[in-house]
Amino acid sequence: MMKSFFSAAALLLGLVAPSAVLAAPSLPGVPREVTRDLLRPVEERQSSCHTAANRACWAPGFDINTDYEVSTPNTGVTRTYTLTLTEVDNWLGPDGVVKQKVMLVNGDIFGPTITANWGDWIQVNVINNLRTNGTSIHWHGLHQKGTNMHDGANGVTECPIPPKGGSRIYRFRAQQYGTSWYHSHFSAQYGNGVVGTIVVNGPASVPYDIDLGVFPITDYYHKPADVLVEETMNGGPPPSDTVLFKGHGKNPQTGAGKFANVTLTPGKRHRLRIINTSTHDHFQLKLQNHTMTIIAADMVPVQAQTVDSLFLAVGQRYDVTIDANKSVGNYWFNATFGGGLACGASLNPHPAAVFRYQGAPNTLPTNIGTPAADANCMDLNNLTPVVSRSVPTSGFTPRPNNTLPVSLTLGGTPLFVWKVNGSSINVDWDKPIVDYVIAQNTSYPPQANVITVNSVNQWTYWLIENDPTGPFSIPHPMHLHGHDFLVVGRSPDQPAGVPQTRYRFNPATDMALLKSSNPVRRDVAMLPANGWLLIAFKSDNPGAWLFHCHIAWHVSGGLSVQYLERPNDLRNGFSQADKNQHNNNCNAWRAYWPTNPFPKIDSGLKVKKWVGEHPDWYIKN
C-alpha cells in the first residue's frame, strides 16, 4: 500500500516520465504568425490627455487614480466581434508536428484579440461549428458586474452552446482596463486551441513610448488535451512538448518551427502584456541583460516595481515596461521552471523568444545569460495597487464555514480526484445554477459545491488550506470569477529548493502575518504547497462565481467551488432579454444532448476524453 502511494505521488508530480480588425484566418495545416496591432487605441479619441509622456491621464475626470469599481467612462460605444469555432484534423503545428485534431477560433490556435477602450461595451457572437462538443467562453478576469449570465461558465451561468451551428451573444462592459484573455470552460477546447487575448485600453502608472501588444505564453502538447486529462487523472502530468511564445516555438528534437521575435526600438520604453494561457505550466521569465518594471497584475494597476525576473502562474497576467537601453543586439527572453516538477516541465530544454533591437543582425543571440532566480512556484506578494483598498483583519476568524481545505483522493477510479471541502465539483450542463436562482430553488445538488453568500457589500474572508491533513500537496493557481480578491496573507515562503513543510493556519501566530492595508489584489494567486492562502472579497457583485484551480487537469478533476453571491439580488437583476437568450440556448442544448452518444467523464468545467477513432466519445451519466 505504501509503495502504491509513493508511486502515485511520483506520477502526480511528474517525477516519472510518461467589429475590430482581425487578421485573416490561417489555412488549415499552415501555421502563421499571430500578430495584432495594439500600438494605438481602437480609435483616436477626441482631446485625449493620454500621451507617451503622461500615461496616467485617460480622459477628463478619469485617470490612473480613478477607482473603476466606482466610476467608469460612459463612451457610448459597443465593440462587436464574431468568434467562430471549428475543428481541423491532422493539423500541422508551429513546431512542425502534425496534431490529430485542433479546435480553432476564427482559424487560429489563438483567436483574435478582443480590443476595447475603458468603458466600452463588448459584444461577441460565438458560433459553435464544432462537430459534437458544446462550448462556453469565459472572459477571464472581467467582473461582469450586472451581467453574470455572460460570464461563460457552463453548468454555472449558462448551458453549453450546442455544436453544428449553435450560437449565442455575450455582452458585457469593459469596467476595468488592462490585459486579459478568454478561453473555453467546456471540453478540451481550452487546451486544444479555443483561447484568445483581451486588451482594454486605459491609463497606466508609468509613461512609455511603444505598446508591443499581447505576449501570450503557453505550454504546447502534441497529444489532444482530452487524452492528457485522462492520463493525468490516472498518472502524472506529462511535460509539455514545447512552449509557445505568441504562437511560435521550436521543436527540441527536430529544430522545426521558429522563435517568436519582438522588436525593440533603441532608447524607447516599451509596454509588454504578458499572459500565461497554459493548461499546466507556470513560468519563471527573464529577459537577458534587462530588467522589467511591473505596472499591472491581473488588470489591477500597481505602483511601478522593477524585477530581474518574473514568476507567472497559469491564468495570470503582468503588464511590464522594458527600457531598450542596452547595446543594439539580440537578447533571449527565457522561460524556466522553478519549484520542482510540480511547477511545470517541458521537453524543450530552452523555451525562449528573441527580443531584437532595431538595427541588430537577424541572428540568434549568442549569450544565454544568467538563469532566472527560482521563485519556488510562488507569485509576488509585495505589489502595491495604485487604487488602495484595505480590509480589517480583525474581522477574520477561521471557522468551518469560511475555511476551504483542498485535498486529493488517491486509489479510486480515476486514480486522482481533487476535492474542496471534501467534495469534488460536478456541474450539470442541462441545469446550471442560475436556473435554481430563477426558480427560487435552494436545493442545490451537493456535487455543485455551492457556497451561498447573502451578506451585502461586506468583506468576506476565505481561508484555503492545501491538503491540511493529507499526505500530499502541490501548489495551485486559484482563480476567482466576478471579483478581484485581496491576498490578505499566506503561509511563510520557503527558500528556493526547500520543500514547503506542513503549515496550517494558527491564529495565535499567523494573525500577525496578515496585511490589512492595501495588500496585493488580483484574480489568480498561488496557494502554497502544504500551506494556506487567505483572501477577501466584498459581496458587491451578485452572481454565481466559480473559484477554482486554473490548472486544467485539476479543475477537470474537481478542484472548484462556486460562490452564489446574493441570489435574491441576482434573480431580481436578470433582464428579460438575458433570460430569454438563456432559456433559448438551454432549450437548444437540451434538445441536442440526448442525441449525443459520447461521455461526460469529468467535472464538466474543462476537458473531456477522446477515445480511439471517435475523438469526442462521451458517455452520458
Swiss-Prot record:
Q: What else is known?
A: Podospora anserina contains at least 3 laccase isozymes named I, II, and III. They differ in their substrate specificity, number of subunits, isoelectronic point and heat stability.
* Induction field: Under oxidative stress on the mycelium by aromatic xenobiotics (guaiacol, hydroquinone, benzoquinone), and by copper salt at a concentration of 1 mM (growing mycelium).
Q: Which reaction does it catalyse?
A: 4 hydroquinone + O2 = 4 benzosemiquinone + 2 H2O
On subunit structure and binding partners, the annotation says: Monomer.
Q: Which GO terms describe its cellular component?
A: extracellular region
Record's subcellular location: Secreted
Q: Does the keyword Glycoprotein apply?
A: yes
- What is the name of this protein? Laccase-2
The enzyme's first-digit EC class, named in words, is: oxidoreductase
Q: Where does Cu cation 1 bind?
A: 138, 479
List, for all copies, the residue spans of the domain called Plastocyanin-like.
78-201, 210-367, 430-566
Cite the SUPFAM superfamilies for this sequence. Answer: Cupredoxins
Ligand binding (Cu cation 4):
476, 549, 554
Cofactor binding comment, as recorded: Binds 4 Cu cations per monomer.
Cofactor names from the entry are: Cu cation
Which residues lie in the propeptide? Answer: 24-48, 606-621
Q: According to the record, which residues are glycosylated?
A: 133, 261, 276, 289, 325, 334, 401, 421, 441
Q: Which GO terms describe its biological process?
A: lignin catabolic process; melanin biosynthetic process
Origin superkingdom: Eukaryota
Q: Name one Pfam family in it.
A: Cu-oxidase_3
- Provide the gene name from the record: LAC2
Q: Which segment of the chain is annotated as a signal peptide?
A: 1-23
